[in-house]
Amino acid sequence: MPHGRVVNTPVTIAIDAMSGDRGAAVVVHAALEAVRENEALSLVLVGIRSELEALLHEGHARIRIVEAADVVRMNERPSHALRHKKNSSMAIALSLVRDGEAQGCVSAGNTGALMAFGRSIIRMYPGIERPAIAKLIPSLRGRCHVLDLGANVDSTAENLYQYALMGSLMASAICRQSEPRVALLNVGEEEIKGNEQVRLASHMLAQCDTINYIGYVEGSDLFRDVADVVVCDGFVGNIALKTGEGVAGLLIELLEQAFTRSMYGRFVGLLARPIIGRLLQLMDPSRHNGASLLGLQGVVIKSHGNANERAMLAAIRQAVREVQLEVPRRINERLDDLML
């Protein structure tokens, strides 16, 4: 699948360094690797200065630290964070994007709080009711954008329609697809299947001449290159994503066991190492970490809360790519023409 051409212009990304499950060390190590591999990249680590400076040791010319007095906890209600955590690492990282000191933000923190702060600080596209979490997942012959993955557990037909618009525009921006195939995730392919909101959204998309809507797909189609954009509500999407990640992890573990259990298995594994290596790389969820908060007028990437160094590095790369491809501007330019 062709991808959007990235111009290697200077980029600054703000990172919420304190909110992930694994602490700041993972973020700092990923940040150091990110600036090593990309000379055009500068990073702003937002968090407790003393802790970050200790982890950075001698520092780096393209990594600076911005002090944050507070941290949003994973179990904190978004409404509480919005009222009481305005000086948190998450809120300050987003404020740097709003103020033009950074072009994008990465956080492994509380998803609901990130959405709430994003809507409050960076603002939404005009006409978009709710943001959506979108992610590129590997498929049989390419990759597929799936959204929403947990921002909104209840979505109306209008919400689903708007997710489809944003997903289609994102696929065009990132993968340079002129007519990405857009589908709704459902319990069957027949028109009568699904709840009322899904059926109504299907009718709305079928009436939209500028969207290449192909109808319903089932969960088993997500990885089969049937569609380029798959739309669902956040409840369904999050379960589908976590199930896929769980199956991938299981397959990786089973393969490792099969090729280490016996002398014969080790011999076969040695012969198959190049093929197995590529397969494991494709299935490894940490290599595909980083979901986009679509609907916000800026690049905001949600990392998995339990991300390791490799996964955090993938999220930083995703933020850089979206900034360099000007994804928010490209979506915003065309949304007005597509809105009902």
UniProtKB/Swiss-Prot annotation:
Primary localization: cytoplasm
Reactions this protein catalyses: a fatty acyl-[ACP] + phosphate = an acyl phosphate + holo-[ACP]
EC number: 2.3.1.274
UniProt xrefs under Gene3D superfamilies: Isopropylmalate Dehydrogenase
Alphabetically ordered keywords of this record: Cytoplasm, Lipid biosynthesis, Lipid metabolism, Phospholipid biosynthesis, Phospholipid metabolism, Transferase
GO biological process, one term: fatty acid biosynthetic process
GO CC annotations, alphabetized: cytoplasm
Pathway recorded for this protein: Lipid metabolism; phospholipid metabolism
Localization annotation: Cytoplasm
Any GO MF annotation of the entry: phosphate:acyl-[acyl carrier protein] acyltransferase activity
Keyword Cytoplasm: yes
Class of the enzyme per the UniProt entry, highest EC level: transferase
Subunit structure: Homodimer. Probably interacts with PlsY.
Assigned protein family: Belongs to the PlsX family.
Job description of the protein: Catalyzes the reversible formation of acyl-phosphate (acyl-PO(4)) from acyl-[acyl-carrier-protein] (acyl-ACP). This enzyme utilizes acyl-ACP as fatty acyl donor, but not acyl-CoA.
PANTHER family in the record: FATTY ACID/PHOSPHOLIPID SYNTHESIS PROTEIN PLSX, PHOSPHATE ACYLTRANSFERASE
Protein name: Phosphate acyltransferase
Organism of provenance: Marinobacter nauticus (strain ATCC 700491 / DSM 11845 / VT8) (Marinobacter aquaeolei)
Phylogenetic classification of the source organism: Bacteria, Pseudomonadati, Pseudomonadota, Gammaproteobacteria, Pseudomonadales
